[in-house]
């Protein structure tokens, strides 16, 4: 059985942290994380940035679907779609692991620009704090937080499966 020890969101930077405890060893959890990520994160090998089995650390860049809206002059609604791009750091110890997301940036291709927007190769980006201040859309962060939760849950499900296979 898994237990959530900590789940928090740093609202000043929109970093998410989840710490979970479970009966599996570091070795099983590490293997589970690598297997689950490789099969469930699209293009994982291209996103992969750091891997250290000794410290139990895995880092990669991930993307989540972005959809937000904002009313403009109480008439038209601006509908923005794109991605949240962010760093995921998974730290694994015996009977415990942490999934942390940080350095999130909103990216989109629509034509509008607002204060703080950076443009590169036709794509527009904005740090998460300014994006959420702009959008005023309480649902805008759902896919980002749900995807981080799926990673934490996927590691646990894979670890259970691996442990059962070992017997």
Task: Please tell me what each predicted stretch does.
Residues 1-167:
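Ser/Thr-rich, low-complexity intrinsically disordered terminal regions
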């Amino acid at each position: 059985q898994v237990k959530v020890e900590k789940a928090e969101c740093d609202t000043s930077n929109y970093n998410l942290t989840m710490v979970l405890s479970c009966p599996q060893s570091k070795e099983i959890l590490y293997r589970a994380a690598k297997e689950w990520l490789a099969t469930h994160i699209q293009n994982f090998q291209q996103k992969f940035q750091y891997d250290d089995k000794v410290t139990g650390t895995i880092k990669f860049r991930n993307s989540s679907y972005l959809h937000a809206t904002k009313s403009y002059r109480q008439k038209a609604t601006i509908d923005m779609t794109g991605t949240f791009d962010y760093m995921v750091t998974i730290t694994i110890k015996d009977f415990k692991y942490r999934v942390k997301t940080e350095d999130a940036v909103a990216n989109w291709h629509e034509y509008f620009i607002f204060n703080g927007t950076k443009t590169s190769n036709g794509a527009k980006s904005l740090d998460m704090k300014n994006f959420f201040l702009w959008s005023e859309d309480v649902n805008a962060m759902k896919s980002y937080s749900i995807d981080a939760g799926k990673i934490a849950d996927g590691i646990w499900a894979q670890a259970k499966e691996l442990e059962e296979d070992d017997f």
